[in-house]
Regions:
Chain C
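Short catalytic helix/loop segments, enriched in acidic residues and glycine
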Residues: 18-40
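Claisen-condensing/thiolase-fold acyl-transfer catalytic domains that form or cleave C-C bonds
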Residues: 21-24, 28-29, 53-106, 110-111, ...
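Flexible, glycine/charged-enriched surface loops at secondary-structure junctions
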Residues: 42-45, 155-161, 174-180, 227-228, ...
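Flexible glycine-/small-residue-enriched beta->alpha junction loops
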Residues: 105-153
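N-terminal leader/propeptide and maturation segments of large enzyme subunits in energy/redox metabolism
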Residues: 136-184
Length: 387, 171, 352
């Protein structure tokens, strides 16, 4: 009984390590203006604004919606700020969609961002906590042991991660917005890059980017007001589980599997590899592609790496289920926005609007985001056709 | 005279905020004991799993953990990574090993350093024991344990990690 | 539009300092209280969970993640979080119910403001380029606002003291209050200024604690066979961040939200207003168009104890309590966020 909603406008900023030409307000406004232009709408056409970003500590601005309301044309309107750790870009899109799907709003603007150059994310992620051992491990230090366990269980060859690192950067080279532009990247170059947290090498890890991503989501009755084809929202789901508990399956978290099952059920998907045309999946460390291929049901347990090695997820190799044609998190990573970029890029695909990284004839796409200790998941399925 | 004056496009605005931090009641009980050199876990009354360091609740059941269980300082490597990035104010030099270790008698792992080992020989299932700092350096912190080092005991099979009693792997 | 009902509410005592209690230990008793009120066990028994908190109060990123440990989130649950007062977590939950993806939701908020120096921490909410480096604390900003009100003859210091005295007296009936008691206007006015024209008594006493609420569809409330109050209207609006560009003596966003929420569509027997400062209660009551028939802050409001990140939810909870107890049949609750009432939420509650 949810109101049908669609993405009618998408706006992003060029992702770079440092946007020294704009303030935080300028950065989010740029994405918002791009989204409005894409939807052929003005500020007055927006009923509410929903923003999201990663921890406030990244930029040191407490509750930034308070400061950003003017930049986002939100004065006199409702404003909400979502924060669900790394999945925030995705969950913000879901909360924004719920504004319309609940029937309470007709058209909303949603923006996510991170201006990492004005912050110290490594510090914020690893602030010494009193009474705890200070390991300065960061995200890599947390995920590397889990990846190692996946490698042990699946007996995957050592270079699966390397292959993903190359594939996603080659995809990114097709995307003018991508932070990393590495059209000449090779397997050898990745293999020889410095090992940071074994088995994660420098070139197998995501960059740190400044950037913002915005979308306009409208109710069915208003969709025709925007000239470009819409991306109909066919399924929305989120799941959380505790960071740690006895017997927790960390390699393929239950929350991810449950979230995928929920969103597939809503979208009428029974075989994700066949039913979906492409996917934008949150892969910040290369090995997470084979791991998520299994977690999301694209490959049987233990065989995600085979799918990767076969080239099935590569646009350049003509794979049947391209993943992260935009370049993914491995090519651009403004943390608070990364989840929404996945959702937005999935929408671009089914609108036929993904430029040089378009999957020919894409009709149904998955957007995926995760955060925390791989414990928060947000996913959506968007389609060119109404359900 | 300097002809080239760069536009100012940003300013550094340091933010210093002081906080009083509390670990919480359950962690505080754990910390008082670790100051005495004793490792204690807390057991969930419903699922019976032992958590160390305890945080006050069993995350799976959502209820307070109360029962204290004294644990030995021997553990098993559940997973690990070799880190190239140094730790500020810590003499340990990269590349070093950080590992998720499960103490005998506990059912979850915690993260800590490993040392006195050949990084390439660290493996899942390996047995380790705590190397404590000198007694006079002990405080309310997990890093009373400087690191864990490998000990000469048989490896724990992967499917048994996290299920051992306080007495370790039975022979 | 689907009706949403409140079926349970609980709030911790407002403590000057929660002492050695971490997030999990603060939240769990309130969650257990609301589950018990309805006859549930843990988060598995509701369809959605949403919380409100602010990392900077505790000085640790991801404070809310710790809260997930209090829920019993195995198997995984549908859960979300706003970095705002839990009144906005309630709002997000209402959207979830109205789109048909949940029949019930658990909402909670918590804060340990005592860990840091709150008024200084809140200065970092301000524009990071122009204002935050000036470290203008939240009390000073409120004092600016109070000064404007006084200078324009819109309130007197006596009016402000009357708000304080009334709230403290009302708080005598509030078992969770941090500050309560009879105090004369003269005693209050004799206090020296803290940040003039604000006296210490004009500032709501900040408290550590947590609050929780369960909401659901009317059908679900009937299935659970528990008394409930209807949320017949809810809306929130934000104003410009630039203090010089809005009228600090009025709350335009509160008036807007009140209009959409339908405040004037019936009698307002009780209004619980989240006013962190005494003069702000007056601004809010005028913006809501409240008359002499409305009892304002019978719980004592935030003046009894300001649970950061949960006070807004508590105002809604206090109105809920008075409806299900039969004291009233219609009331208004308000929540605020940001400097000088920048962002305001208004909810109208009615008996079934």
């Amino acid at each position: 009984m949810a109101t049908l909603a669609a993405v009618v406008g998408i706006g992003q900023t060029r992702y770079k390590s440092r946007r020294g030409d704009v303030s935080i307000a300028g950065l989010v406004r740029e994405a918002a203006v791009n989204a409005l232009k894409d939807a052929d709408l003005g500020w007055d056409d927006i009923d509410a604004v929903i923003i999201g970003k990663a921890p406030d500590m990244f930029e040191g601005v407490v509750m930034p919606e308070i400061y950003l309301t003017d930049a986002l044309g939100c004065n006199g309107k409702p404003m909400l700020r979502v924060h669900t750790a790394g999945s925030v870009g995705g969950s913000t899109a879901l909360v924004a969609a719920s504004h319309v799907q609940s029937g309470m709003f007709k058209r909303v603007l949603t923006v996510t961002f991170e201006k990492q150059s004005e912050s110290n994310a490594m510090w914020a992620l690893s602030t010494p906590q009193p009474f705890s051992v200070h390991l300065n491990a960061g995200a890599g230090g947390y995920f590397a042991p889990i990846i190692r366990e996946y490698m042990r269980r699946s007996k995957a060859p050592y270079d699966v991660g390397i292959k993903v690192a190359v594939k996603d950067r080659l995809h990114g080279a097709r995307n003018p917005l991508s932070h990393l532009q590495l059209p000449k990247i090779t397997m050898q170059e990745v293999e020889e890059s410095m090992m940071l947290w074994d088995p994660i090498r420098f070139l197998e890890a995501c960059p740190s980017s400044d950037g913002a991503c915005a979308m306009v989501i409208a109710a069915e009755e208003l969709v025709a007001q925007s000239p470009k084809p819409p991306a109909w929202i066919r399924g929305v789901a989120m799941r959380s589980e505790p960071t740690m508990y006895a017997g927790r399956e960390e390699v393929s978290p239950q929350a991810g599997r449950d979230c995928a099952a929920d969103v597939y059920r809503q979208a009428g998907i029974s075989d994700p590899r066949k039913d979906l045309d492409c996917a934008e999946v949150y892969v910040p460390f290369s090995w997470y592609e084979p791991m998520w291929l299994e977690n999301l049901g694209f490959a049987p347990q233990g065989e995600g790496w085979k799918l990767t090695m076969s080239g099935a997820t590569s646009l350049d190799d003509g794979g049947d289920i391209p993943w992260n044609c935009s370049g993914g998190v491995l090519s651009s990573n403004p943390i608070g926005a990364s989840g929404m970029i996945r959702f937005a890029e999935a929408a671009r695909q089914v609108r036929g609007d993904a430029g040089n990284h378009q999957v020919e004839g894409a009709k149904l796409a998955l957007g995926h985001a995760y955060g925390g200790g791989a414990q928060f998941f947000a996913m959506w399925v968007v389609g060119a056709e109404k359900p | 005279m300097n002809d080239q004056v760069e536009d100012i496009t940003g300013i550094e605005t340091p933010v210093y905020l002081h906080y009083h931090f509390t670990a919480g009641s359950a962690p505080a009980r754990f910390l008082r004991r670790i100051k005495e050199g004793v490792l204690t876990g807390q057991r969930c009354p419903r699922c019976r799993n032992v958590y160390i360091p305890p945080r006050g609740s069993c995350p799976a059941c959502g209820i307070p953990t109360e029962d204290e269980v004294v644990l030995p300082d021997k553990a098993t490597v559940q997973s690990f990574t070799v880190v190239a990035i140094p730790i500020p104010n810590n003499p340990i030099k990269p590349p070093f090993v950080i590992a998720n270790l499960v103490l005998d008698g506990a059912n979850i792992s915690f993260i800590h350093l490993m040392s006195e080992c050949d990084n390439s020989e660290v493996h899942i299932g390996q047995r380790v024991q705590a190397v404590w700092k000198p007694v006079d350096e002990w405080t309310y912190a997990m890093d009373n344990i400087r690191y864990f080092r490998p000990i000469d005991e048989p490896d724990v099979p992967v499917d048994r990690i996290g299920t051992l009693a306080t007495t370790g792997l039975e022979t | 539009m689907k009706d949403v009902a409140i079926v349970a509410f609980s709030q911790s005592d407002c403590l000057a300092q929660a002492g050695a209690a971490n997030e999990v230990e603060l939240i769990m008793p309130q969650l257990q209280a609301v589950f018990q009120q309805v006859g549930l066990n843990n988060a598995q028994d509701v369809d959605f969970v949403c919380s409100g908190s602010c990392d900077y109060l505790q000085g640790a990123a991801f404070a809310f993640v710790a809260g997930v440990d209090a829920l019993g989130a195995v198997p995984p649950i549908k859960e979300s979080h706003v970095e705002m007062d839990a009144a906005w977590a309630l709002y997000e939950s209402i959207l979830k119910i109205r789109m048909g993806h949940a029949e019930s939701a658990l909402v909670y908020g918590f804060g340990r403001a005592s860990s840091g120096n709150l008024r200084t921490v809140l200065s970092q909410q301000l524009d990071p380029y122009y204002l935050a480096p000036l470290w203008i604390d939240s009390i000073s900003l409120a004092a600016l606002q109070a000064r404007m009100l006084l200078d324009r003859g819109l309130v007197t210091e006596r009016d402000m003291a009357e708000v304080v005295a009334r709230c403290r007296r009302n708080a005598l009936n509030n078992p969770h209050a941090r500050l309560s008691g009879e105090i004369s206007i003269e005693t209050l006015l004799a206090e020296p200024g803290l940040v003039a024209p604000l006296r210490k008594s004009d500032c709501a006493p900040v408290a550590d604690g947590a609050a929780a609420m369960i909401i659901c569809t009317v059908e679900q409330a009937r299935e659970w066979a528990v008394p409930f109050a209807l949320i017949s209207g809810i809306d929130h609006r934000i104003e410009t961040h630039n203090l010089g560009m809005r009228d600090l003596c009025d709350s335009v966003s509160t008036r807007l939200a009140a209009g959409t929420a339908g405040v004037a569509q019936g009698p307002v027997e009780v209004a619980e207003l989240y006013a962190p400062f005494s003069h702000q209660e007056i601004i809010l009551s005028r913006a809501l168009g409240l008359g002499a028939d409305t009892e304002i802050n019978p719980s004592g409001g935030a003046m009894a104890g300001n649970l950061m990140m949960a006070s807004g939810l508590s105002r809604i909870g206090e109105v809920f309590r008075r409806i299900v107890s039969g004291d009233i049949s219609r009331g208004v609750a308000h929540a605020t966020s940001g400097p000088c009432l920048q962002h305001n939420l208004v909810a109208v509650l009615e008996s079934a």
